[in-house]
Structure formats: C-alpha cells, structure tokens
C-alpha cells in the first residue's frame, strides 16, 4: 500500500484537502471567538450556522461557473478570491461590530465553498474510483484538524491567526490550480467499467441521508458550541484530537472490503450518536456526549465527502456533485440552527427524545435505499462468467466420456 498510496500526486491532493479543512474549521473557530465579543452564546451559534450555510452558495456556484468561465477569467477569479479572503479574515479578527463581523464571515464562507468544491472535484477526477479514496479523505481531514490544534495551542493572537489562515488559503488555491484537469473526468473509463445501477437515485438518497444525519450531528454540535461560547469548555483543545483520530479510523474502516461495509458502519455510528443525545437529555454526562460527538463527527464528514466524490464521476456535471456532501451538510445546519438551539435550551427531554428517535428511523430507511441504489453491476458479469466456466467444464466432461444428449440431460 505504501508504494501505491504515498505518491506525489496523491500527497498534493491530500495537502489541498487538508488545507481546506484547516481553513474551513480554523476560520469557524476564529469567527466564534470574535463573535462572542458581540453577542451571547446563543447568538454565536446562530451566527455560526448562518456563515456555514452561506458556504452552500459557494459549493453550488462552482458547479455552475466552472464550465462557463474562460481560463483567464478563472485565474483572475482565483487571485481575487485570495485577496478578498484576506480582507474578510482581517475584518473578522477586528470584530468592529456584529454586522461587519457577520458580513465578513458570510463572504468568506462563500469563497471557501467555491474552493472546497474545486478541491473535491480535483480529488474526484483522479481518485474517485481508487481503492483508497476514504483513506485519502480521512488522512486529509485528520491533518487539517491537527494543524488547527497546533494553531490553537501555539498562536494566541487573533491577528496572527488571520494571517496564517490567509496564507493557508493562498496555498490551497495554488495547489488546486496546479492540479488542473482538462475537460471531463480523466478517469471516466473507470466509472464506465464499474457502473452504478441507479446513480441519480443513489445521489438523491445520499443527499437525503446526509440531510437527516445532519439534524443529529448539528444538534450535538450546537450543544457543544453553546458550552464553548459560554466558557464552560474550549473545543479547540483535546477534543479536536479525538476528531482527527476518528477521521483516520473512519477512512481505514470505510475502505475495508472495498467499501462494502461503509454504509453499515455509518449506520452504527449514527445509532451511537442518537443514544448519546438521549443520554445527555436524560441528565447523563456531558463529557460523554462531547467524546461521542467528536468520535462520530469524523466518521460523518468522511462518509459524505467520500460518497459524493465517488458519485461525481457518474454525473453529467461532476463539478456540481463532488462537494455536494459538504453543501447539504452546511445548508441543513443553517435550516435547523435556531430550532435546535431552542430545543436544547427548552430542556424538554420528551420532545428531544421523540425527534431523535424519529430521525433515526428515517435515517435507517434512507441508508437502506441508498445502499440498494448505489450497488454496482459487477456481480452479474462474475456470475455469468462462473456459469460459463461450469458449462465449459461439463462440455469437456461429456466429450471425454462420449455422453449422449440423453445422458447429458440426466446429469444436468
């Protein structure tokens, strides 16, 4: 695996993905800290959901613009995005007012959405059908989180953080420009040789599954963010390492058996997260909920990222689908942000339990449908080949012993 996995091209793609994860999460952490100077913990959670939701615009915008813009316009847009991102990060760390900080966050995450969709498309073009796709995504996610962990523990100045995030974003743009892909997917022949039975149905059910799972994980995330904004914990410390480990482990587990157990593993992780919510609302340990959240969140990110990167090659506009997982996740986060905060603050354990169990039932149905629709058609050729081999063996046996047609019918 070492010779196959650790190649320069894959390392560059993983570095770009890692930088995206680092900037995306690092900017979110910086935004939360700066917004805490302007509003209470509930306001921070709502503002965070707004900026994360705005990234959905960027993810979808890339799929629309990539095929229409000329090469010179793309280069100019990339340079402009780098400058605008630097301005937005500086405005966030200044946090002059609630409105200016929120506006800078909204613009920044639109840019991050475009960059994220671009880097996921690059990954789909080269590694969408690779055996180690989930490991590639998982390692990148873990590296990005580890970089953020180092920044949080070594850098304690908002201005310096903004500068570092800006440089990382510029490096990300440089790498994705370096790994350009001409025309459609370069490895489309691999997709044609291993077709999914119902690719668009699988894509729709995957989106529906991610949307439902987001309701579970976003609720846990909001509960943790409320504690962070309120000062009861610092989510930039050791919990981030748990998240990094879960990203690594999920990548290995999802690729085990050529990915055939990926949906089952994610189903079990979702069950664990649902139980965790029920334990917390019943008065259980919040620390336990924090640990389970970070363990499961890494699995969730690698799951939807891998699923959409793989499906992109089967679509007519792969640029639109490669980053769809993150787009759906962030859009659902903004849609349920205020509702989940109100539900958590209400302390109504009965409503929370009913909502959690209902969501889990829907997730179970969605995962089953996605598994069926996402199956490839490789089993049928193998079965036909086996039948042909058996027929050839029987024909050779009949010729050897000079069996009559009647004797052959009896033996069959």
Please give the residue ranges for each predicted region.
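Pair of pore-lining "gating" transmembrane helices in MFS-fold secondary transporters
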Residues: 2-48, 194-220, 291-295
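C-terminal transmembrane helical hairpin of 12-TM major facilitator-type secondary transporters
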Residues: 261-302
């Amino acid at each position: 695996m070492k010779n196959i996995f650790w190649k320069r091209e894959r390392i560059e793609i993983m570095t770009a993905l890692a930088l995206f994860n680092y900037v995306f999460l690092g900017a979110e952490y910086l935004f939360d800290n700066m917004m805490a100077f302007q509003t209470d913990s509930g306001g921070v959670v709502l503002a965070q959901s707004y900026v994360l939701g705005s990234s959905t615009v960027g993810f979808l915008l890339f799929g629309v613009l990539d095929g229409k813009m000329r090469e010179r316009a793309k280069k100019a847009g990339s340079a402009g995005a780098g400058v605008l991102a630097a301005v937005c990060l500086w405005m966030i760390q200044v946090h002059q007012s609630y409105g200016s900080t929120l506006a800078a966050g909204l613009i920044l995450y639109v840019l991050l959405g475009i960059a994220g969709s671009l880097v996921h498309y690059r990954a789909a073009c080269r590694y969408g059908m690779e055996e180690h796709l989930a490991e590639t995504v998982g390692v990148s996610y873990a590296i990005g989180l580890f970089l953020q962990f180092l920044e949080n523990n070594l850098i304690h100045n908002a201005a310096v953080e903004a500068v570092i995030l800006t440089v990382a974003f510029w490096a990300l743009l440089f790498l994705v420009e370096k790994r350009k892909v001409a025309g459609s997917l370069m490895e489309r022949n691999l997709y044609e040789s291993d077709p999914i039975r119902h690719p668009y149905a699988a894509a729709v059910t995957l989106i529906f599954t991610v949307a439902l799972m987001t309701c579970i994980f976003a609720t846990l995330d909001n509960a943790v963010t409320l504690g962070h904004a309120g000062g009861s914990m610092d989510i930039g410390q050791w919990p981030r390492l748990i998240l990094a480990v879960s990203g690594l482990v999920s990548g290995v587990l999802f690729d085990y058996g050529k990915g055939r157990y990926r949906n089952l593993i994610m189903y079990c992780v979702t069950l664990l997260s649902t139980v965790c919510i029920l334990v917390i609302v019943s008065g259980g340990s919040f620390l336990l909920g924090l640990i389970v959240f970070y363990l499961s969140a890494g699995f969730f990110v690698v799951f939807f990222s891998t699923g959409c990167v793989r499906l992109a090659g089967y679509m007519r506009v792969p640029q639109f689908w490669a980053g769809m997982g993150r787009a759906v996740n962030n859009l659902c986060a903004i849609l349920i942000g205020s509702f989940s905060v109100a539900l958590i603050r209400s302390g109504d354990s009965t409503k929370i339990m009913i909502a959690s169990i209902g969501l889990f039932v829907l997730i179970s149905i969605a995962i089953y449908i996605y598994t069926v629709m996402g199956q490839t058609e490789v089993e049928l050729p193998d079965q036909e080949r086996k039948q042909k081999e058996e027929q050839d063996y029987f024909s050779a046996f009949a010729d050897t012993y000079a069996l009559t047609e009647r004797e052959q019918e009896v033996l069959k």
